[in-house]
Amino acid sequence: MTLAAPIAVYVLAALAEIAGCFAFWAWLRLGKSPLWLVPGMVSLAVFAWLLTRVDADFAGRAYAAYGGIYVTASLGWLWLTEGQVPTRWDILGGGLCVLGAMVILAGPRAA
């Protein structure tokens, strides 16, 4: 099993989820226009659709593996969009999350 396809989908899903959630953050915390919610909701719908594209027998397993990718993507957002450099603890935690996601994705399954 190749991990490239699900990881690519998870990365795209993470970007869609973070962008959608940030639209709400911008509206509620940064005083942006409520119109920010329109692309935010579209982005969240794209996120949900993308998660259904992962070849997994159970939604919970797909979501659990996604979580590790999401944490790492969030740290990238923190750095690239918000200008806050992740700490070494952020990086260590993100790495552990990705490792956990890889274990979930690549672990053997009963036939």
UniProtKB/Swiss-Prot annotation:
Magnesium listed as a keyword: no
Localisation per UniProt entry: Cell inner membrane
Cysteine disulfide links: none
InterPro entries registered for this protein in UniProt: UPF0060
Principal location: membrane
Residues spanning the signal sequence: none
An annotated GO cellular component: plasma membrane
Similarity comment: family membership: Belongs to the UPF0060 family.
Name by which UniProt lists this protein: UPF0060 membrane protein Pden_1837
Organism listed in the record: Paracoccus denitrificans (strain Pd 1222)
